[in-house]
Amino acid sequence: MARNAEKAMTALARFRQAQLEEGKVKERRPFLASECTELPKAEKWRRQIIGEISKKVAQIQNAGLGEFRIRDLNDEINKLLREKGHWEVRIKELGGPDYGKVGPKMLDHEGKEVPGNRGYKYFGAAKDLPGVRELFEKEPLPPPRKTRAELMKAIDFEYYGYLDEDDGVIVPLEQEYEKKLRAELVEKWKAEREARLARGEKEEEEEEEEEINIYAVTEEESDEEGNQEKAGEDGQQKFIAHVPVPSQQEIEEALVRRKKMELLQKYASETLQAQSEEAKRLLGY
């Protein structure tokens, strides 16, 4: 059973429609909405535009029309939507209802608008056209940033350069560069040496031999240093002499003697201390 749209396109239907319209003056829709001065006619033209939009939206659902036909239909629908908006503004100016607020928005909801495209919408199969599908795909979320603790977990010896020589590449390069630098330094030293000889200056080796060793210490100097007098901060004379370093045994004996003296001073009487000092003097300690 044929559809109504197919019946309307038959030759008999077109002929019958032509007979009905014969003798009538077909009124055309004004090009500009501002040219209409009657509210009923403005309502009529708005309804006519809505009917055309509905037909074209139904046609564009067929993906087999071809890319170029689908693009043309989508452009025509967007053009009619803009024209419908102009007529709604004109109806409001003529005292009619504000369709921008109270009118149905089903036609607008059928289209999908690309962000930043100034109201241009895609209907039906136009959404799946090449280059259009990518516009509606959401951008993938960026990978989450790693925290400082996660970054520190990946740090190893290689990060600090301890394993750079294991690849066997950098060592030969460094050796080659080192030889090159040494050769340049030798050439520079030879050039400076020849320049000094040309000016009649002595070589550095001869100058080093003639220099006096300031660190050499003779017996006379050591005796003089032992008896040298220097003034201190308080103005008193201080004698600097080289004394032998005591051994570990001598240090222990000195500590024992000091401990004995502290015990005698703490527990012995003055008479006993005097007797002890007298005995030490007689024995020659």
Curated annotation (Swiss-Prot):
Q: Name one GO biological process term.
A: generation of catalytic spliceosome for second transesterification step
Arranged from A to Z, the UniProt key words for this protein are: Acetylation, mRNA processing, mRNA splicing, Nucleus, Phosphoprotein, Spliceosome
Instruction: Give start-end positions of Basic and acidic residues composition bias.
Output: 227-236
- On this chain, the residues bearing N6-acetyllysine are 127
Q: Looking at the record's lineage, which domain of life comes first?
A: Eukaryota
Which residues lie in Acidic residues bias regions?
Answer: 203-226
Residue(s) carrying Phosphoserine: 247
Any Pfam family from its record, for instance, is Isy1
| Keyword match ATP-binding | no
* Keyword Transmembrane helix appears in the UniProt entry: no
Record text on subunit structure and interactions: Identified in the spliceosome C complex. Component of the XAB2 complex, a multimeric protein complex composed of XAB2, PRPF19, AQR, ZNF830, ISY1, and PPIE. Identified in a pentameric intron-binding (IB) complex composed of AQR, XAB2, ISY1, ZNF830 and PPIE that is incorporated into the spliceosome as a preassembled complex. The IB complex does not contain PRPF19. Interacts with CPSF3; this interaction is in an RNA independent manner. Interacts with the microprocessor complex subunits DGCR8 and DROSHA; this interaction is in an RNA dependent manner.
What is the name attached to this protein's record? Pre-mRNA-splicing factor ISY1 homolog
From the broadest rank down, the organism's phylogenetic lineage runs: Eukaryota, Metazoa, Chordata, Craniata, Vertebrata
